[in-house]
């Protein structure tokens, strides 16, 4: 609520999601005018989306904002908030959204982040489902901790097979999330790549791999013990992956634009956000 009140003091229209209407009206008590809209209409009309929450909330906002090219400003209410630009104690920096420097340039900018385009192909190579994500695509056995068998292909050529608990394909943005926890590399978002990280591989030789993001990656379910595996994109979208089916991953034409109010570099942010967990 205090974020909305801060923004309402500037020359802008503050729009809020309809599901927050009762809470905001109760706290606002008529002090400031707000426009309440359904989520789809909100994203269609917005020039910028301000998200209060953790990284999960920002991922959901990115999914909705990317098709419209709307920039996203994250304010951390979660634990790490790696993609968030501000903490609650830094709301004074919101003034930079409406300020210019001595040369007349805006005092904020956006970072463009690549996204994954993900499709599920049937055994007959027909597209059964498609989705996109900012962080990662994860193939696992679901809630049962049982090893799976999959094959990884790049541009139609077999790279390797895995016997593992699962496999993560991450963007540079997603390389600091689940992939990093599984022992994957941290990729600077200026690098155009996919990070492929096996989860608990049953092998002495299995290692994380990095591919250029103009490659087409395919992961085929060859597991004979299980009827189906599960594909999860950004921890939100969950689909069954049946035996003989394939997940195809490419660089999506969509981009996420993250609003930055400071000149922090990638490694400054990495140190600051991860310091409490090192």
List the model feature ranges, each with a label.
Residues 157-205:
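Gly/Ser/Thr-rich active-site loops/lids in small-molecule metabolic enzymes
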Residues 79-165:
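Catalytic core of DAGKc-family lipid kinases
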Residues 51-55, 63-64:
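N-terminal glycine-rich "phosphate-gripper" loop used for MgATP/nucleotide binding
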Residues 24, 78-83, 185-187, 203-204:
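Short gly/pro/ser/thr-enriched loop/turn and capping motifs at secondary-structure boundaries
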